[in-house]
């Protein structure tokens, strides 16, 4: 798995299945950013999401391009980008639709994303 503080970009189903299985087994909170290269709000939130990954080192952060992995986007019922899905042990526990930095931050705190000490 990627090191702590990184966003794991999955470009194939094989990589996604392997990485999400490892993350689920770790019992850590998982946040998936469903994004698209043509989506301006997605481009706006991407560096913010990367900073969150550095800040919340006990959370596993994924990035999925909906055009590359349509099957995964459909499985998670993604209808707008960006959509952020929060999971624990394979279960969806929350979601945020839109580039809502504060709401994403609140959900990270709510679901156990402990902030690393600086």
UniProtKB/Swiss-Prot annotation:
SUPFAM superfamilies: Thioredoxin-like. Induction: By treatment with salicylic acid (SA), abscisic acid (ABA), iron, copper and UV-C. Induced by wounding, oxidative stress, infection with incompatible P.syringae and treatment with the fungal phytotoxin victorin. The active site is at 39 (nucleophile), 42 (nucleophile). One of its GO terms (cellular component) is cytosol. InterPro entries: Thioredoxin-like_sf, Thioredoxin_CS, Thioredoxin_domain, Thioredoxin_H-type-like. Disruption phenotype: Insensitivity to victorin phytotoxin. Keywords: Acetylation, Cytoplasm, Disulfide bond, Electron transport, Redox-active center, Transport. PROSITE patterns: THIOREDOXIN_1, THIOREDOXIN_2. It is found in: Cytoplasm. Thiol-disulfide oxidoreductase involved in response to pathogens and oxidative stresses. Required for the response to victorin, a phytotoxin which induces programmed cell death in sensitive plants. Possesses insulin disulfide bonds reducing activity. Belongs to the thioredoxin family. Plant H-type subfamily. This is Thioredoxin H5. It comes from Arabidopsis thaliana (Mouse-ear cress). The lineage of its organism: Eukaryota, Viridiplantae, Streptophyta, Embryophyta, Tracheophyta.
